[in-house]
Structure formats: C-alpha cells, structure tokens
Amino acid sequence: MAEGEEPEKKRRRIEELNEKMVVDGGSGDRSEWQGRWDHVRKFLERTGPFTHPDFEASTESLQFLLDTCKILVIGAGGLGCELLKDLALSGFRHIHVVDMDTIDVSNLNRQFLFRPKDVGRPKAEVAADFVNDRVPGCSVVPHFKKIQDLDETFYRQFHIVVCGLDSVIARRWMNGMLLSLLIYEDGVLDPSSIIPLIDGGTEGFKGNARVILPGMTACIDCTLELYPPQINFPMCTIASMPRLPEHCVEYVRMLLWPKEKPFGDGVVLDGDDPKHIQWVYQKSLERAAEFNITGVTYRLTQGVVKRIIPAVASTNAVIAAACATEVFKIATSAYVPLNNYLVFNDVDGLYTYTFEAERKENCSACSQVPQDMQFTPSAKLQEVLDYLTENASLQMKSPAITTTLDGKNKTLYLQTVASIEERTRPNLSKTLKELGLVDGQELAVADVTTPQTVLFKLKFIS
C-alpha cells in the first residue's frame, strides 16, 4: 500500500482483497483465492518439451501437493529458511521442520525468517510461525530437537526429506536412517519403501545439491571423499606454541575441558549451550593473555567449537531453489529429476556442473554386505580403531566395537561412556589374536555418524 493512505481507503482495499477470496471446500478457510496457484498449474496441467515422458497433465498433481504430500525439512538455518519459503510458495502445505539450534544475532543478516526480537528462541518454532502466518493455508510443524531424538515411525510418514545441514555427521545419520527404512523381499528392494533425500550444502560462494534415492543411487557415504576433512591443528602447537586465537580455543576444547570437567563427569561439550561456550571463551581469553595473543571473541570461540562454515545469503538462495525444484519434480513426477549431483560456484563468474555420482559396491552404509577389513593377526585393536576413523570412506568419529565370542556379545572398545572406556581401554594395546578374534570374524561397529550398526568382516593377511 502507498505510504500515507487514509485509514478508510486502506480498509476498502482490504475488503476488496477479501471479496476476491474463494472459500476452500466450504470449510470457511479463506486461504485460497482466485488464481493463487496459477503459476503451479502451468507446470502440472499442460505438457511441454521438458516434461517427463510418462507425465500426464491433470489437476490431480496439484491436489496431491496441496492436500497429501508431506515434506520434512532438516535444518532451519540459512538453507532451511530459503527452503521453507520456496516449498510453501510452490504448493506444499504439509511441512515439518527439525532444528536443535536457537537464533543468534549473527543469523539475522541472512536467515530472513528471524527478527531481533527472536534472538534466543528456537529456530524451528520461529520459522514455522513466520511461514504459517505469511502463507495462508500452509501448515509448518516445528520440532525443536535433534534428528537423533526422533524415531523410525516419525521419519516413515514423509514422502520426501530435504536437508539444509552444516554438519557431515548429521547428513550421514539422516542418510543411515532412510536406508534403515528400506524393505527388501527376497533380496529385492521394495520401491514403495524409498523416501527420496534431497541434500543441499553451501560454503561461501560454493554450493551443491543432490538427489539420493536410498538403495538405488549413490548415498552420502558412497561419496564421503567429496566432503573436505575438518581442519585440525597439531597438538604440539596447541599445547606449547600457540600463535593464533584458534589455537587457544582448541587448547581449551581438547585439553582443558576433559581435564577440568566444568559441568560434571561425562558431560560432552555442546556448541549450542551458551554456558559451555561462555566457559570455553573465558578460558581461551586466559590462554591468549598468557601468550600475548589477540583476537579471541565469543563468536570466534563458537565458530571453532562448532566448526562453523562461512555463509553467503545468495548462495543459500540458489541451492535452496535447486533443492526445492527437485522436491517438486519428484513429488509431481512432472519432470525428470536431477541425475544426481549439481555443483555451483560463483567465486569468479558463474559456474554450474552436473554429474552422476556413482554408487559404491562396498559402501559401508548402503551395500547390504559386511565390508572386509584386512589386518595381520598381530595387529593391535588400536590399529583397527585408527582405520575406522582415518579411512576416507569411513571417517567415523567415536566408533564402538563389539563382536561375538563363545556365543556371547563382547564389547572390545567403547569410548562414549567413561566407565566402559576405562574398562575396555587395555584392549587397544592387545593384538587381534590375543583378543580371541579369528579370520572371518564379524565386528559390529556403532558410531554417531549412523543410526545403524555397521558390520565388518575381519580378514587376516600374512
């Protein structure tokens, strides 16, 4: 409305808009108005040169989007805000969003669903409220929790899952969850059990979008080598010769936290807990002052602890649009979906490239067969642990290793529970033979990167 309009004129204009509304199904819900979905109908109620060969234009596809299709968005940050907006305006009206984070003032420059008054509130709840208020008829249901806190029944209800995450671990866990929902009959995959995963990621002016059909195409773990490893600083530098503010934060995170246990025994440092970050920040300042290092800030501390990646709003918009387009293609079957990996880069000019990521036959996540591990009988369990964490195809974080000996389950090593870690630590220095393991022995490995236990088959070599 033009600025300075008289109240009476404003009122008349609002009444005119209301008169154009069409009651949807006689329910009294004025969430539909004449021509609201014309932009979507142009794609679904006529054919064109790019439509899927088997697509038949009809009104049913739009009704499926509006009334039936359920979409799960993981993450309500930079990508997530864009995704929620794009999906809601594309006709998807049944959306759930999961995010465990709260709004920080640094989010406001690019996460446009949030306002200064929202700082400190859960991202999922604020984003859902904003979209529900702004897009009539759309129902966004928020879940302020970790993805690991939701069970199989929850995930099974959705037609498509779309991720806007900044964590490789969370991506892998979500990938593993959708793989665990697959149903096989006599070794043949039941297509109706497949829940497509659309994954987007950004880093500065670079981004990617991919389409994953669990059990059919390359999964996250099949292409794990594509994700850059986290930057780690040498321990000797952190402990004795710090030169950067990041060194001070890493010193507190890696050495002081487990030593001083400021919040009790067994409490893991949580990058989303303000009390934890404040403690690390204060200790980092003390460490920096000791070595005359400047530049330690609260924001830097949180960035180092959470491994925060720089974000650019325009990149988020492009990748979210690509992901939302793929969701639309798959939900309606109107167009052939991406096959299956899109790369975007606008550092120098504009560059995009699409290629087909290939599925790994021996992928530890989706291959359905135990992966071979080759060691000598004299190799120590520590070497197996190093293999699980350092191998580019596995990149596990805190693997727990169990096996079956004499018909009983035996935990060889588990580091996430302090009492069990202390009891099983001596096993790390023992050889595989001393532990009673034999050629062909199956090892079950659990890790934070997957909701499933991963099976490995031990193969002794000379």
Swiss-Prot record:
Alphabetical list of Gene3D superfamilies matching this protein: NAD(P)-binding Rossmann-like Domain, Ubiquitin activating enzymes (Uba3). Chain: B, domain 2, Ubiquitin-like 2 activating enzyme e1b. Chain: B, domain 3
Region (Interaction with ube2m N-terminus): 52-69, 156-160, 191-216, 330-337
Role summary: Catalytic subunit of the dimeric uba3-nae1 E1 enzyme. E1 activates nedd8 by first adenylating its C-terminal glycine residue with ATP, thereafter linking this residue to the side chain of the catalytic cysteine, yielding a nedd8-uba3 thioester and free AMP. E1 finally transfers nedd8 to the catalytic cysteine of ube2m.
Short name of one Pfam family: E2_bind
EC number annotated for this UniProt entry: 6.2.1.64
Enzyme class (EC, first level): ligase
Region (Interaction with nae1): 241-247, 291-294
Protein name: NEDD8-activating enzyme E1 catalytic subunit
Binding site for ATP: 99-123, 147-170
Catalytic activity as recorded in UniProt: ATP + [NEDD8 protein] + [E1 NEDD8-activating enzyme]-L-cysteine = AMP + diphosphate + [E1 NEDD8-activating enzyme]-S-[NEDD8 protein]-yl-L-cysteine
Chain segments carrying region Interaction with ube2m core domain: 367-462
Organism of derivation: Danio rerio (Zebrafish)
Site for Determines specificity for nedd8, residues: R210
Subunit structure: Heterodimer of uba3 and nae1. Interacts with nedd8, ube2f and ube2m.
Pathway annotation from the record: Protein modification; protein neddylation
Spans traversing the lipid bilayer: none
Residue segments, region Interaction with nedd8: 226-228, 351-356
Any GO MF annotation of the entry: ATP binding
GO CC terms of this entry: cytoplasm; nucleus
Gene it is expressed from: uba3
Note: Arg-210 acts as a selectivity gate, preventing misactivation of ubiquitin by this NEDD8-specific E1 complex.
Record keywords: ATP-binding, Ligase, Nucleotide-binding, Ubl conjugation pathway
Stated family: Belongs to the ubiquitin-activating E1 family. UBA3 subfamily.
